[in-house]
Amino acid sequence: MYDKQEVELDGLINRVKFFCEDRDWDQYHNPKDLAIGLSTESNELLDIFRFKSEAQMQEMMKEEKCREHISEELADVFFFVLRFAQMYEIDLEKALTDKLEKNNKKYPAEKVRGRNLKYTEYEG
């Protein structure tokens, strides 16, 4: 599935940074436009699955051409995440670690295992 080779996040962020700088795109990458880009690309990923049944989606995930399309859309989403973090000095590793800690408290495994409820639905 994956090559177990570790990918350094900083290296990917730098590749995105240089890609954009080579094209003089910093001027277009304010927080609003980066958020719009992220949302747009996320919706392009979502559109692949629109009006599909569970069975159809499972079949799609077996098709190489469809998997390639999905991979490209995921890469577009990841690009905007990395670019936003790079432009506005957000430490993604710390942000994710902190968020996982918060979610671990909101969604303790012993309470939510096998359930997909929002934390407000099982508190109390």
Language-model segments: residues:
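Flexible "arm" and connector segments at domain edges
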Residues: 1-74, 78-124
